[in-house]
Amino acid sequence: MSIEAVWGTLQDGLNLLYRREHMSKKYYMMLYDAVYNICTTTTLANSNNNSPEFASEFLYKQLENYIRTYVIAIRDRISACSGDELLGKCTIEWDNFKFSTRICNCIFQYLNRNFVSKKVEDKNGEIVEIYKLALDIWKAEFFDNFKVKTIDAILELILLERCGSTINSTHISSVVECLTELDIYKVSFEPQFLDATKLFYKQEVLNSKETVIEYMITVENRLFQEEYRSRRYLGPSTNDLLIDSCESILISDRLKFLHSEFERLLEARKDEHLTRMYSLCRRVTHGLEDLRVYLEKRILKEGHETLQRLAKDSGLKTTPKEYITKLLEVHEIYFNLINKAFDRNALFMQSLDKASKDFIEANAVTMLAPEKHRSTRSADYLARYCDQLLKKNSKVQDETALDKALTVLKYISEKDVFQLYYQNWFSERIINNSSASDDAEEKFITNLTATEGLEYTRNLVKMVEDAKISKDLTTEFKDIKTEKSIDFNVILQTTGAWPSLDQIKIILPRELSTILKEFDTFYNASHNGRRLNWAYSQCRGEVNSKAFEKKYVFIVTASQLCTLYLFNEQDSFTIEQISKAIEMTAKSTSAIVGSLNPVIDPVLVVDKGNEKDGYPPDAVVSLNTKYANKKVRVDLTTAIKKATADRETDAVQNTVESDRKYEIKACIVRIMKTRKSLTHTLLINEIISQLKSRFTPNVQMIKICIEILIEQLYIRRSENEHNVYEYLA
């Protein structure tokens, strides 16, 4: 059989294939074998050339001519079509052509593997794989003739869809697939599509008369539509470019317009629209920056206005609870807003932190304090608030209140001040047995450790340990003490861990001094080498009174107890006699007598003088036999607490200053030991950087500490540069 005859058989098969008529597997294999025979059998060659290569080349050329003729016929058949009709015809013809060509490629696979692959290896650019050959012919003979009309038709359909019409997107996706297969999608279609998109949305923005909220809803819908459109029938490379183009025109170019509504939405608490604005603006570069700035200003403004109202309403009577509650209210509003509407954005959280720190550290309430206490007022109030929460009979029902208190601490620079105030109040709760729950105390200290570190809570942890040990020791001692009528509890305080208060010396009643001596003996028996010092200034007690018409239980300090105990012997004493009896100074005696001689319900009465100016030595102090009080348990320590409150505040300030100097000096030595040599400016900056988590170091104090260390020969000024410090080993 001649090669022409074999080609005739193949041509019949191709006609069947491209007409999409049924082809049996047997017929398919017969065509495959025919291709194989042409490419391998020399007897099929004509008389002029009987090589397989000649036959393969003949077959390749014949197939190329066949496909070209077929494509030209299709082109001529639909040349008059346009618009959606053209797209429909193109879709049908392309789908048929693509399917038939893939089968054709399989039939001629042997030609691909041998003849074509060798030509490709030899870099013969005219010979390509059969499927690629068919695509090249389709592009050259068909698509190049309809390219403009086809792309215009696609863009027209997309425009109709954008304007609300329903279209047959199958035609678009099929043509887009064709463009992609022909490798001309990005060159021929994508740029025109993006240009048309930009033109459409620029015109839409120009014609828009919507409010900001209406516009945001429109943009949301438009972006959703474009993303959906891209997924439905556009190439994968287009999505990002398409969305970028839309975002640029609809959002970036309209940021000022969008941002203009932000403050009003904040004031009105329109979370839904704030979320919408945030979601849109976060899509573009610098879209959130102005919002962040607006938010920070708004938080700052609301924080200060809230505290101004509180200062105006309550003034100096502002309670720690009122103050901390207001701080938390403002913070919680915007913390929840950022969580809900702004997806917990880190930059927005930073703005919340910055604004909160600003209005918490200095505000209208702190300005009511004496100037020297203004910077520490927030720390003071926070410590008092925590004390209220942890005391028995706390009126605060919120179980998370203590956790929220730590939120305020986060924004207080003077954390060392809070530490000292909290330590003082914690000490009082332990001494007075006024804690609501030991578990709550320990949990708060654990949380405080987690946020501020082990060193920060070292003394508090030691105080807890001391309190536990004290309970065990008290229980053991009660079993052996001889005086059973007096209930006695002891609290051991490790030196340095507990607040340092004024130490006083007084003469205790015999019954009490006997118990103390017994405890000394008991303690020393099992703790050899340790010495106990009784801190009378921190002692508290309860005494039963039968001197009045009604029985009372008085809660008193040690000094008050000793003073009242004298009246078991007689009804009146002079100030001088009381002072000698309990071995206290005249000034201290006047203060104690004054605490028992308040204006309302005095237990003792004095015939002349007053506490403020000091009672004269000969002033007679008598038991008020007419004393009456509605309460059975009466706390007589209240007056002393009020009198010592300011002194304790000043003491905390002095302790803070002393501790800070020590920390600054230690920090300087650490830095210089590591760095060996540093300029003055770099040293100052390094000190502030290392200590800012505990407090904000005062530059003047740093300079003083540097001079002290120079005098103590830890560092020196460089001989060559006066502004440089050197470490002395």
Curated annotation (Swiss-Prot):
GO molecular function, one term: protein-macromolecule adaptor activity
Cross-link for Glycyl lysine isopeptide (Lys-Gly) (interchain with G-Cter in NEDD8), residue positions: 673
PROSITE patterns from the UniProt entry: CULLIN_1 (PS01256), CULLIN_2 (PS50069)
GO BP terms in the entry: defense response to virus; protein ubiquitination; SCF-dependent proteasomal ubiquitin-dependent protein catabolic process
PTM info: Neddylated; which enhances the ubiquitination activity of SCF-like complex.
PANTHER family: CULLIN
Stated family: Belongs to the cullin family.
Subunit structure: Probably interacts with skr-3.
Function per UniProt: Probable core component of cullin-based SCF-like E3 ubiquitin-protein ligase complexes which mediate the ubiquitination and subsequent proteasomal degradation of target proteins.
Listed name of the protein: Cullin-6
Organism: Caenorhabditis elegans
